[in-house]
Amino acid sequence: MADRGLPSEAPVVTTSPAGPPSDGPMQRLLASLAGLRQPPTPTAETANGADDPAFLATAKLRAAMAAFLLSGTAIAPADARDCWRPLLEHLCALHRAHGLPETALLAENLPGLLVHRLVVALPEAPDQAFREMEVIKDTILAVTGSDTSHALDSAGLRTAAALGPVRVRQCAVEWIDRWQTVTKSCLAMSPRTSIEALGETSLKMAPVPLGQPSANLTTPAYSLLFPAPFVQEGLRFLALVSNRVTLFSAHLQRIDDATLTPLTRALFTLALVDEYLTTPERGAVVPPPLLAQFQHTVREIDPAIMIPPLEANKMVRSREEVRVSTALSRVSPRSACAPPGTLMARVRTDVAVFDPDVPFLSSSALAVFQPAVSSLLQLGEQPSAGAQQRLLALLQQTWTLIQNTNSPSVVINTLIDAGFTPSHCTHYLSALEGFLAAGVPARTPTGHGLGEVQQLFGCIALAGSNVFGLAREYGYYANYVKTFRRVQGASEHTHGRLCEAVGLSGGVLSQTLARIMGPAVPTEHLASLRRALVGEFETAERRFSSGQPSLLRETALIWIDVYGQTHWDITPTTPATPLSALLPVGQPSHAPSVHLAAATQIRFPALEGIHPNVLADPGFVPYVLALVVGDALRATCSAAYLPRPVEFALRVLAWARDFGLGYLPTVEGHRTKLGALITLLEPAARGGLGPTMQMADNIEQLLRELYVISRGAVEQLRPLVQLQPPPPPEVGTSLLLISMYALAARGVLQDLAERADPLIRQLEDAIVLLRLHMRTLSAFFECRFESDGRRLYAVVGDTPDRLGPWPPEAMGDAVSQYCSMYHDAKRALVASLASLRSVITETTAHLGVCDELAAQVSHEDNVLAVVRREIHGFLSVVSGIHARASKLLSGDQVPGFCFMGQFLARWRRLSACYQAARAAAGPEPVAEFVQELHDTWKGLQTERAVVVAPLVSSADQRAAAIREVMAHAPEDAPPQSPAADRVVLTSRRDLGAWGDYSLGPLGQTTAVPDSVDLSRQGLAVTLSMDWLLMNELLRVTDGVFRASAFRPLAGPESPRDLEVRDAGNSLPAPMPMDAQKPEAYGHGPRQADREGAPHSNTPVEDDEMIPEDTVAPPTDLPLTSYQ
């Protein structure tokens, strides 16, 4: 039927791709109504014909309203305010002129129908989001004001319709006000927006279930506005804010749980700070109540969990362990690292911390100790029987709860209570990926891979990581459907190897996510909106058409069906007229010749020209479906996925959808399918984003369903007329499908390349760092190290030149930190390899899909084949990079640490046997110690017999390695003199050596000599004499003793002795009899020369009261030994 006015290419008017077009649905409706405002007077020749001007005006009016209802283009608030008054005026005038139920329904419900099309995009900033919502509120108030009610009253129309001004104003304004209140309350509790406001009350907040804050905004009272864009955007913004509060409040319950051990509470606090209270711009911001609580908790921790600094310096440390150790040592959750050379205790991370007889961790939250768990998972160590039973009990209980619940809040609380926070899940996945990437299962017994503990950790971490990822956006809004589909589709590809190892591949993980985090379907909301529209149509039909069905009822319901299908993946459940029921039964209303004559009048883009009685005849329906739907299929399938061709195809699809509207029933939902096809193709006409593979599949499915309808109509007409059916929509014959699939496949390839590019850069950076650290450590341990007893020197060559010196603890800490940098680079390499592996898996699956599509095209050099070759080339490059980079993870040992590891292993065995021999009561441990010594010596002799490989680095390279590793370690300053480093111990330092002293005077009592006159006259003479008081005598004696124990520093100023005061004696010091004669005490002139000298009996510094000749020069101990 291409000769009936359907051009292969028609001129089109392009629209702006940015934002709603200036010629939007509201402007087009306004232009159509303005043209129909004054209908022409019917003439005698066309009084009763199909070309009656009144009939044509009515048909055009209904077509304009149908186009507005079915349009998927959004309307800007400014356009709505500008067009509202004239649009309502034209509608009321046309209703007065025609009295149609459609004009009444559209005028009465236009505020609600307009609100459902207002475009809104809320920014992430709360202030801007509130301003945008205020713009929507002002627009709604403008279109539902008193002017609107007055205009409707003047035209004899209702203002209290379901989507009328009264209901919409009340419902929309109430919803926006409530949304603002709820959102502001959530922002007040959100740790991201109000960290400083988190006080004692906030730290005691009750848990907030996921999605609860938006529950009052999705009640049936707001069903009529639920699909509106401002409602959907508001729910999305509120979900992003409230979900953070939900996760924060669930985590907050554990930091002060009295049933947990102090270490467990402290670890939960650190995880809380790292997860919610740390930002790249400001670092960790800890509220004072939380800081005080953490300090109190740390003081209760058993010190046995910490390893002493000197012993900890010998161990390789991870960044996460350093974070925990530093925070516990400094009693501050802000501390994340220690300065180089700092001696600091280290928290234990060995598997023994999980033993049941060690009360460090609570059994209900063992997974919160992330450094210990990561070490357990990555190294594959076998815990003790008690520790394994304890871990399995927690893991099995947690996994069972996850598998047997459908509540997101229950799953989130279960994960966090067990210690599986979002960051911990990521770390555990990285550890398990590192275990698999390093080939660790090859070292396990034959037939074994991951252990039972590792498998359960992997299952919970995989589910938890995806649950937390979805929980950040979980909500009752349409965009969450796309988010869930994306995460669900990638869940088993991101960690494909691990999913297979733990038994979650093959759709198990995706089904678990669908059961827990699947989007809620607004079936009841859409059903309520449908019932409200049906009720409005019935009301208008009773008032203005004597109860006859309105010709736009089906159109309004198609709008709802298309929205549910394209936004929520809801298949319309409204029963359509089956194609078999349209066959004429009995005597047809019109002869076949009438049908044929009317069929010849079907031309694009005309919607009129056929009498309504013929359109309403069921016998004419197959002609319309065969011709109109067939032409729409031909135009669509032959259009390339480019703006101009697709825009022409959209015009043909809209014509097919609106043809016979009001007279011709919908058959097999053909209008719904055409509307959904228009919605899916509209982005291409606006030059928007490219198609996706899912979109291409949906369009192909819709085309196939329309083809079935059209071909069925052709088969019904075959006895009467021979019509050429449209070609089936195959990839090999449809330009639209092959171009869509090619663009979609290219888009997937581009997304994969964009994901792979930073991963490869990370791989490159990690490999470069690994190479540098490997060479540096190898050269570092090729050096010789010498000691003078308390300092270490590095000898890089045969010359006697040495580098250093450094304190042993500083060198140990520097080596430990440099090895941590090596392990950080190795972990980054493992994470990048795991992510790149997921890209390879997705690319392989995508290549298989493209192979199937390319096989449907007969000619070889088609666009799909080109894209397939590009995908294959990309897969080859990425797979090669992955294979080569994976070889770097084949070893366990830090390069350069091989011999050091052997030495430490032998030393630990000898130390353990030696300790056992010392504590042994029998000869067996001693014999074992001797045997261990023999074996160690024999091994050393065997190694020495092997020819030692020459050094691979030069002296300059070794010196550079020393400087690189020890860059931040402070060098030990050389001593001032050889004597300064020497301490001579004599009997004077031994407080228990009393053999050289006579203890007799200490036991004698005081006796008054006979020469003392105790008479009154004698005492009077005695008291009038000058006396040396006891306090002065003791002060001088103490000064002499102390000064002899110190050696004065070289220089004009000598060290000042410490003054000892008797703080327990409250009696005042005795005053001398002659306070004006300081010379009587032997050092009066020295004190008299001092300005403002105190009284002779007033306590002063000891060194100033000691005569110079009584201060003996110290000979044995420097002053610095006491400091």
Swiss-Prot record:
Enzyme Commission numbers on file: 3.5.1.-, 3.5.1.44
Region of interest: Disordered: 1-27, 1047-1123
GO molecular function: identical protein binding; protein-glutamine glutaminase activity
Result of changing residue 850 to S: Complete loss of deamidase activity
Enzyme class: hydrolase
Sequence segments annotated as region (Interaction with large tegument protein): 568-1123
Disulfide bonds: none
Localization terms from the record: Virion tegument; Host cytoplasm; Host nucleus; Host Golgi apparatus, Host trans-Golgi network
Top-level taxon in the UniProt lineage: Viruses
Pfam family, one: Herpes_UL37_1
Catalytic activities: L-asparaginyl-[protein] + H2O = L-aspartyl-[protein] + NH4(+); L-glutaminyl-[protein] + H2O = L-glutamyl-[protein] + NH4(+)
GO biological process: microtubule-dependent intracellular transport of viral material towards cell periphery; symbiont-mediated suppression of cytoplasmic pattern recognition receptor signaling pathway; symbiont-mediated suppression of host cytoplasmic pattern recognition receptor signaling pathway via inhibition of RIG-I activity; virion assembly
GO cellular component: host cell; host cell cytoplasm; host cell Golgi apparatus; host cell nucleus; viral tegument
Keywords: Host cytoplasm, Host Golgi apparatus, Host nucleus, Host-virus interaction, Hydrolase, Inhibition of host innate immune response by virus, Inhibition of host RIG-I by virus, Inhibition of host RLR pathway by virus, Viral immunoevasion, Virion, Virion tegument
Quaternary assembly: Interacts (via C-terminus) with the large tegument protein/LTP (via N-terminus). Interacts with host DST. Interacts with host RIGI; this interaction inhibits RIGI activation. Interacts with host CGAS; this interaction inhibits host CGAS activation. Interacts with host TAOK3.
Protein's job: Plays an essential role in cytoplasmic secondary envelopment during viral egress. Interacts with the capsid via the large tegument protein/LTP and participates in its transport to the host trans-Golgi network (TGN) where secondary envelopment occurs. Modulates tegumentation and capsid accumulation at the viral assembly complex. Plays a role in microtubule-based retrograde axonal transport to promote neuroinvasion. Also plays a role in the inhibition of host immune response by acting as a viral deamidase. Deamidates host RIGI on two asparagines which becomes unable to sense viral dsRNA.
Family membership: Belongs to the herpesviridae inner tegument protein family.
Protein name: Inner tegument protein
Encoding gene, per UniProt annotation: UL37
